[in-house]
């Protein structure tokens, strides 16, 4: 913020700058531009008092100047008159320039009003377009409900089919368990069959071996019989030969016959004993082999019966397994067909849902785009309103400055023609009045500009409140609560800012000695900067509100 200061010896003002902190007020009021206009109208009284003080100071200064002219020569008077003429010509040129600028400002205001009307018409059209998608939303919601019901029915059917599938899977698992048990029993039977076959083979081998041993024993028995017969024949031949020799030598050896009889008896006993032992061994061996053969025959018969029974059971289980397998294949085929049908229905429903979601997304994007355009138009409208207010303030400032200059010129002309009485007495009063006006005016103007900025920001916040009222009905209550809190906080901040401004004005009245002045162009730039800052803040707030709206819609 800058303050203005005037030099009474120069009708044209000098520009001096004195920096002071800027004010940022976030208060929200619904006064609009009426508060700004009332503030502008309320400035007329202090400005008039300042103009009176300025005219008095100017008249005093002109009186002191004429008092000094009496003591000057004619050449100096001519130089002073030429300076005054040049100053008047400069003032006329400046006045003409200001009039031209005022006309340009008025034309610009008219153009901005026309643009504002056009933008308001476009805003109405966009609001109408924004109100239209509610019908589509109802239709889409109805279709979504129907599709959700269809999806729920499909889900229930899927659950029923899954239950049936689970029951079939339980049956299949039971059949598979039975099949595995039968396979295990078959493997056990086959193992037992192999063992029986192995035992039968071993029994056959043992029987063949025994038969071979019987044959060998029979051959040995026949050989022994033959040997025995040969021995008997030899013994008989020897006995006959001995008998003949005994008969021939009877006279010589009478005891040989008795010895031969003893020997014959001994050999007969030995042969009979050997024969009896061989027959007993053969009979015992034959009985043992017969018993083992009978036992092996019974075991082979039992094994054959068990193998035939196992084959019969295996054939029956194989037929049952084939039937179960066929039933399982049929059920799996039916289940696969049901799954394919269900997946096709689900994919069709999902495609329909995706299509509706895409349409809903496009509709939401269009709504967001319309809202963004609406926000842009509102921002442009607010910027234009701020610019118009800034131009209006500039024009009023120029009017006040022109009134100051016109009053000063009139009073200076009047004092040049009037007689001068008591100028030495009024010289101190003139200097003190000038210092009072020049020191108090910058402080007054700085407080005035601060109040204007506060009013501008209040109008911006009022526009924000209007936009918040035009927002969707779902967020109305929350936004009203937030706006109420912001209004309370903004009211407190505004009161604090006003108290700070009053304190600054009092401090400026008491101890401020620096004089400064800021041009209308810089005021316009500051107003534009504040407008841009507020526009950016509004955009951020609207983006946050849009995000909250989308989240609320998603939750709904």
Swiss-Prot record:
Q: Where in the cell is it found?
A: Cell projection, Axon; Cytoplasm, Cytoskeleton
Q: Where is this region: Linker 12?
A: 236-254
GO MF annotation terms? identical protein binding; structural constituent of cytoskeleton; structural constituent of postsynaptic intermediate filament cytoskeleton
Q: Acetylation: present as a keyword of the record?
A: yes
Annotated segments matching region Tail, subdomain A: 399-445
Please give the family membership noted in the entry.
Belongs to the intermediate filament family.
- Outline the subunit composition: Forms homodimers (in vitro).
> What's the name of the protein?
Neurofilament light polypeptide
Source species: Coturnix japonica (Japanese quail)
């Amino acid at each position: 913020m800058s303050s203005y200061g005037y030099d009474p010896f120069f009708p044209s003002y000098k520009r001096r700058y004195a920096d002071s902190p800027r004010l940022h007020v976030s208060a929200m009021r619904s006064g609009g531009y009426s508060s700004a206009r009332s503030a502008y109208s309320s400035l007329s009284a202090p400005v008039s008092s300042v103009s009176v003080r300025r005219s008095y100071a100017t008249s005093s200064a002109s009186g002191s100047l004429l008092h000094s002219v009496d003591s000057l020569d004619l050449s100096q008077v001519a130089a002073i008159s030429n300076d005054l003429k040049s100053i008047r010509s400069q003032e006329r040129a400046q006045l003409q320039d200001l009039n031209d600028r005022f006309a340009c400002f008025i034309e610009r205001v008219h153009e901005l009003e026309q643009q504002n009307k056009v933008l308001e018409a476009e805003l109405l059209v966009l609001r109408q377009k924004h109100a239209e998608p509610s019908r589509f939303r109802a239709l889409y919601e109805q279709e979504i409900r129907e599709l959700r019901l269809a999806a729920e029915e499909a889900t229930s059917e899927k659950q029923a089919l899954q239950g049936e599938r689970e029951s079939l899977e339980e049956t299949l698992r039971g059949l598979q368990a039975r099949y595995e048990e039968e396979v295990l029993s078959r493997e056990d039977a086959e193992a037992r069959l192999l063992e029986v076959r192995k035992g039968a083979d071993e029994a056959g081998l043992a029987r063949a071996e025994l038969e071979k041993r019987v044959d060998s024993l029979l051959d040995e028995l026949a050989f022994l019989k033959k040997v025995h017969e040969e021995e008997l024949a030899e013994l008989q031949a020897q006995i006959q030969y001995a008998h003949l020799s005994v008969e021939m030598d009877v006279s010589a050896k009478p005891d040989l016959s008795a010895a031969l009889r003893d020997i014959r008896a001994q050999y007969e006993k030995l042969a009979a004993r050997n024969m009896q032992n061989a027959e007993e061994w053969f009979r015992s061996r034959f009985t043992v082999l017969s018993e083992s053969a009978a036992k092996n025959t019974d075991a082979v018969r039992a094994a054959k019966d068990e193998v035939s029974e196992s084959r019969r059971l295996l054939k029956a289980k194989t037929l049952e397994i084939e039937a179960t397998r066929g039933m399982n294949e049929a059920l799996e085929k039916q289940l696969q067909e049901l799954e394919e049908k269900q997946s096709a229905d689900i994919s069709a429903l999902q495609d329909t849902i995706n299509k509706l979601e895409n349409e809903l997304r496009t509709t939401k994007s269009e709504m967001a785009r319309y809202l963004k355009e609406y926000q842009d138009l509102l921002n442009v409208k607010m910027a234009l309103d701020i610019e118009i207010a800034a131009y209006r303030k500039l024009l009023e400032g120029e009017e006040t400055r022109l009134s100051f200059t016109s009053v000063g010129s009139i009073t200076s002309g009047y004092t040049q023609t009037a007689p001068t009485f008591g100028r030495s007495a009024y010289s101190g009063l003139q200097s003190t009045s000038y210092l009072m006006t020049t020191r108090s005016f910058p402080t007054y103007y700085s407080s005035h500009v601060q109040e204007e900025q506060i009013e501008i920001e209040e109008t911006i916040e009022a526009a924000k409140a209007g936009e918040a009222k035009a927002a969707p009905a779902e967020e109305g209550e929350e936004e009203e609560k937030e706006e109420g809190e912001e209004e309370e906080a903004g009211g407190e901040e505004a009161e604090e800012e006003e108290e700070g401004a009053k304190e600054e004005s009092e401090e400026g009245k008491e101890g401020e000695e620096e004089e400064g002045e800021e041009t209308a162009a810089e005021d316009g730039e500051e107003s534009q900067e504040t407008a841009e800052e507020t526009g950016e803040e509004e955009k951020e707030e609207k983006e946050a509100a849009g995000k909250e709206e989308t989240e609320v819609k998603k939750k709904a």
